[in-house]
């Protein structure tokens, strides 16, 4: 019997009830192989009366027997196999019914068409049915977690054979489907195109060859006949024809003709043609051609050589041609002027003056005529810009009037137009917009504050902010748009309509009844809507009105005493509306006594200001005050204080409201005035009757009065009736009508004049035919020749409709502009604000459009359609106006938009087609068949849709892009993809919990590496599986680094948070603030558009993908999510998830873990959850909901699990000067790009090291200065900086937590022991003050002052300073500066850094990568190896010394005994102590040399140093459980983070290291020593685990090994009992496993297990016992001593450095013994003075040097 599990797998294989001919037998064979059974077939011939043979097949399998018969060509074996499969699958229905097929088309009853169509149908149906059925078999109808686990079934479990065959078959069928659907049609089309193209080329080539042969024969004949010119002409004609120049010429002429006709050029006047710039250019070309032709006629030989020779003489070929062209251009200009004078009838002077003036005059007159209309004049009262333009018309007219040489007609036009232009000018002067009517009530802003708070200083920035709101944004507007009013001067001299008036120190004059303060009453007049007529001293400035819109008063006292006005509230009502008390913030103020009153006030302390800012606006705060007569002060505070930014926004908002209110009132008054009139100006009270006008005028002239005339008219009833009608209808001609009539006459005369000139020109051209022909031909030829020059600017853009692959029609590359959102920063489109409009039906049923933002209100273009037409119309039925309205104004939220969308969804008609993908579900891009149309131009322009939410889009392409990773792991050599994870804060990321379940189901070993990758950065982070969970037999348990996220009811979400702190993981930016709040979830009603950032994998590697999500909506029901059917055993087949988000999206396997963001500009926070599942069949996706509250709860849970998880609260923030969207270039390796800096750093390119005067005299140089700039090496540009940085981005090892913990705890024990009994431990268990961190404690040699001569770091080094190094901020010489502005600014930066670290913010510390200017071996310099030094910023150095320097001093005071040699004086007895320690375990010693030590540092060990060593030290004097202790721990953690994951800059590229520590930090050597001790203990553990597991603990390491470290140098003394295993060879091997290069220090090439103490070097010094001193001494390498004499440094006197080096060399060579001393002494004394040495050096005797060493009697020995 087969197992139930096997039968279930078989049933899944046999679910498909229909198999095809090709697969029947093979499928049954596969089933048989699965059951390890055989299928037996028996064939028998059956007697049949038919002519065709009949066979019977008997199929036996698993006890079943099937018999089938086959006739003729039918295969009974296949039929038997099919029926056997049907029997096994339980299908008893052998006839499923008829199959629907395509109907046959009618083709004129021709049987051939019928047979052809049937054959095509059979072929198509066969392919379609095959593809359809194959896809149906493998189609998945359940919801699966998309974590890429369903692709792992084929290779993993040998014991589980269930479903292997089916999965292989499904995979093959999938590939067949993809091939049939994609590859095959393309191959067929390409083959057909290739064949056709090849055939065409062959035919074309054949024709071309025939043509060439014929031309060659013809030319040969002409040459035989000696017709050389004719043969040359034939060749030229053939070339012209062969390359299609003839057709091109015809096309150019036709295009030019079409464009001329289309542009209406024939309607241009002759004058316009004459003045056209092309006419000028064409004429020059014609004259040049004529000149060249004339040159050819110079007497002489006519052959080409002679022609070129002669052309060379007039003068020098090309130069001569250029000069001739210039001369011809001058002559043409003269001729052109003569033609103009002849055509226009002007003299030369008139032509020069009137050149182009007539057109300007006519345009000016037409513009004046335009503003005479009533509707245009009304605009003057509403629009300042229109008023200014009308004013300029009068000024321009005066300019035209001054022209003395205008024609009579033009002069008449100017004089006629001047009077109405003047009247318009006067109308503008009296217009309300110029101050003569109702005006805007100005905003009265009253700023009150004590003297010295800085009121005046912040006034101009405030004015600039208000002017910007007014639209005056030029940089100098604040100069002339702000008027300073001094009331004591009485007059407003200099006022030119400024919008802002400032009363500085207002109301200083006492107000008295007899001597009133004019400011008081001016406040009442100014703060009003009535026109304020200003008192001006100059006569021409009279009639000036105030146009101020903001009145700004500053004063010291808000209790203004009023005596001269009867109603004081009129003053306070105006001033109290915007009254604010100004004061500095507390942190920027200083308490100052107010006179002798005993009261104090806060005065601005200028020493606390930011010296980098000219005006620091952040120091002010503004408190609103309101009038309250009940209070003692008369005023009380209202609301909370505002900072400057909020205050400026408030003032601008108030101005905007007042401005809008003023415009509304003015508009109302104008409308009210119109309604008050009896009729319009055109329908006034009088009619037109010339008889009554003449009669009345004559009788009035005779002396009759109007009353007498009317009395006479009344005596005749019929006449009075006519007079009454005349009086009722006629109106007297207004002055504007007179102006219009007169100007119409003048314009008519002008047109008549121009027409007359046009006829004269025609007559002249007719009388001069030669000139006419020359001009026309010249223009035609010139236009043809220049057409090609202008074609690029004239031709419309042509584009290929779709890419065809044809090189002739390929689309040219263009600058890209992003229409939708692709995620690429380089093509990101700036989104313009969207104007929201509203469609609604009024009471009459008409559609109206209204927009509150722009004030638009009008009827819709759809009102001309009936209801039936409106309901049934399609987009093609709309007219031009309706389409424009629909495209420009209808949004998805408008009534009209919703109507069309809902109706067209039912009718399946798409109105909107999205050009790019914006994420809007209603505008998804329609799929369109693409057809190549040759050179067809794109006529229809698609309306594009911009990004609906710019904030969400920037979040996607910036933060999501850098915080999202793809997770994967290796099994063997194959990589398996898991899914996505996203870092939400610092080192903490979230991922679906089913990832953990799936990994556990695969039974991966704990040391399996989970890799986190991004596009172009694979395996950027590597974490062992043991970091996530510990596995049991049937279950697993999350470690302290992970926590699940629960719902409120206790159920868990499909989400787990993981903290990767202490791993090779960089801190990330904070995403938590972008997640929605729980209170926001209630707002997510309906459906939204969204997006998610994910990764896909293809043959090219990993690449980022943005999926746009449609109809994102809450899903309140529970959903069942199935684990993939991948052959692994899960704890459960499925799990339930409730309260999800559902959306429509083509998600795919591997998208799980992607963050879901909404595109909704009204939603402040955009992230709502994480993708956890999808349904491939229905294209539905599901997301786990996430909020800020649940994430914060998870962070707290992590901290409760383990105190080290306090690191989960930390995050990185990009500094302000860094643009995260900038295209940053990072060195090769594993680095994390951050962006581009606005501040660029430079590099030193010239070395300060120079050869000395005795270079090469004493020894052959073995070193030279390192390269400091890019250099060409081996024909390639070598950048030494990037080459050196590449070493810091190498892969590092992933170590076991247990072994690292064991080693680090043992190192902690050694380091914290007190070996120096003279030390007071409490002196070092404290935090230094700021002053101590800079100048030192002054009582400890290892807590000395900071080095102030070195670089201050970034960005201080880029600031302007007057002293080198850090002295600008810390002082010079013996004095330390703590009070200057620079010193205070530095202190502020240090305090801010410490505060940031305390709050969990890692930011604003950037190390500068620079090349180290030093001597290196010549071989290394020749290959470009230069060491890189990373200088830290000084504010970080100070802060780090505050918290870590005492611990470093403790280690140095206990040196040597604690394995650390830092602080050792190599000239003192310290070297003897080191030698003794290295002999305690015997004579076996090794001294290894690390290669690329800094670049190989493992972040795991660096964090172990912090947590297992330093924090243990910190706990001895700080209680980290209370708030203050927790704060100090956070500060230290933040400062340490700046080292382990340091941020660097080179040029302007900012990036982060994933591990290592920068060489320029103040703790470099100490960290390297501690690291060295830990890594050597790890080597012991691994070596002993291989050879002697019994001895792997730290007890035996300390028993058998004595270690000394100094940075990356170390020496080990190993006991003889273990040296067989723990030696140089084995240590190097295990170091390689840990990604460290550790070789023999001697570099002799001989591999030895150990050496003797006297054979090794430590710090480039040997161990030599001195019989004279009776102790071990430290002789420097002899070659180093001699090499130092070959070099000096650039300085004022390089010889002084040389003499100092000679003295040092003798003090060093003494340690080598008397023989080496004598050798050096003889060599130096042999040098000539002054040729080789500047002076005779001082050389002591050998014994004197020994004496100095014994007593350390030289500054050199003060190490």
From Swiss-Prot:
<dbReference type="InterPro" id="IPR004004">
    <property type="entry name" value="Helic/Pol/Pept_Calicivir-typ"/>
</dbReference>
<dbReference type="InterPro" id="IPR001205">
    <property type="entry name" value="RNA-dir_pol_C"/>
</dbReference>
<feature type="site" description="Cleavage; by 3C-like protease">
    <location>
        <begin position="701"/>
        <end position="702"/>
    </location>
</feature>
<feature type="site" description="Cleavage; by 3C-like protease">
    <location>
        <begin position="818"/>
        <end position="819"/>
    </location>
</feature>
<dbReference type="Pfam" id="PF00680">
    <property type="entry name" value="RdRP_1"/>
</dbReference>
<keyword id="KW-0693">Viral RNA replication</keyword>
<keyword id="KW-0175">Coiled coil</keyword>
<keyword id="KW-0788">Thiol protease</keyword>
<dbReference type="GO" id="GO:0039694">
    <property type="term" value="P:viral RNA genome replication"/>
</dbReference>
<feature type="domain" description="SF3 helicase">
    <location>
        <begin position="421"/>
        <end position="595"/>
    </location>
</feature>
<dbReference type="GO" id="GO:0044164">
    <property type="term" value="C:host cell cytosol"/>
</dbReference>
<feature type="active site" description="For picornain 3C-like protease activity">
    <location>
        <position position="1152"/>
    </location>
</feature>
<dbReference type="InterPro" id="IPR044067">
    <property type="entry name" value="PCV_3C_PRO"/>
</dbReference>
<protein>
    <recommendedName>
        <fullName>Replicase polyprotein</fullName>
        <ecNumber>3.4.22.-</ecNumber>
        <ecNumber>2.7.7.48</ecNumber>
    </recommendedName>
</protein>
<keyword id="KW-0347">Helicase</keyword>
<comment type="function">
    <text>Protein 1A functions as a suppressor of RNA-mediated gene silencing, an antiviral defense mechanism of insect cells. Binds to long dsRNA and to a lesser extent, to siRNA.</text>
</comment>
<dbReference type="InterPro" id="IPR007094">
    <property type="entry name" value="RNA-dir_pol_PSvirus"/>
</dbReference>
<feature type="coiled-coil region">
    <location>
        <begin position="113"/>
        <end position="140"/>
    </location>
</feature>
<keyword id="KW-0378">Hydrolase</keyword>
<dbReference type="GO" id="GO:0052170">
    <property type="term" value="P:symbiont-mediated suppression of host innate immune response"/>
</dbReference>
<dbReference type="Pfam" id="PF12381">
    <property type="entry name" value="Peptidase_C3G"/>
</dbReference>
<keyword id="KW-0941">Suppressor of RNA silencing</keyword>
<dbReference type="GO" id="GO:0006508">
    <property type="term" value="P:proteolysis"/>
</dbReference>
<dbReference type="GO" id="GO:0004197">
    <property type="term" value="F:cysteine-type endopeptidase activity"/>
</dbReference>
<keyword id="KW-0547">Nucleotide-binding</keyword>
<dbReference type="InterPro" id="IPR024387">
    <property type="entry name" value="Pept_C3G_Picornavir"/>
</dbReference>
<keyword id="KW-1090">Inhibition of host innate immune response by virus</keyword>
<dbReference type="GO" id="GO:0106222">
    <property type="term" value="F:lncRNA binding"/>
</dbReference>
<dbReference type="InterPro" id="IPR014759">
    <property type="entry name" value="Helicase_SF3_ssRNA_vir"/>
</dbReference>
<feature type="domain" description="Peptidase C3">
    <location>
        <begin position="950"/>
        <end position="1191"/>
    </location>
</feature>
<dbReference type="InterPro" id="IPR043128">
    <property type="entry name" value="Rev_trsase/Diguanyl_cyclase"/>
</dbReference>
<dbReference type="GO" id="GO:0003724">
    <property type="term" value="F:RNA helicase activity"/>
</dbReference>
<comment type="function">
    <text>RNA-directed RNA polymerase replicates genomic and antigenomic RNA.</text>
</comment>
<feature type="active site" description="For picornain 3C-like protease activity">
    <location>
        <position position="994"/>
    </location>
</feature>
<keyword id="KW-0945">Host-virus interaction</keyword>
<dbReference type="InterPro" id="IPR043502">
    <property type="entry name" value="DNA/RNA_pol_sf"/>
</dbReference>
<keyword id="KW-0808">Transferase</keyword>
<feature type="site" description="Cleavage; by 3C-like protease">
    <location>
        <begin position="901"/>
        <end position="902"/>
    </location>
</feature>
<dbReference type="Pfam" id="PF00910">
    <property type="entry name" value="RNA_helicase"/>
</dbReference>
<feature type="active site" description="For picornain 3C-like protease activity">
    <location>
        <position position="1054"/>
    </location>
</feature>
<keyword id="KW-0899">Viral immunoevasion</keyword>
<dbReference type="InterPro" id="IPR014720">
    <property type="entry name" value="dsRBD_dom"/>
</dbReference>
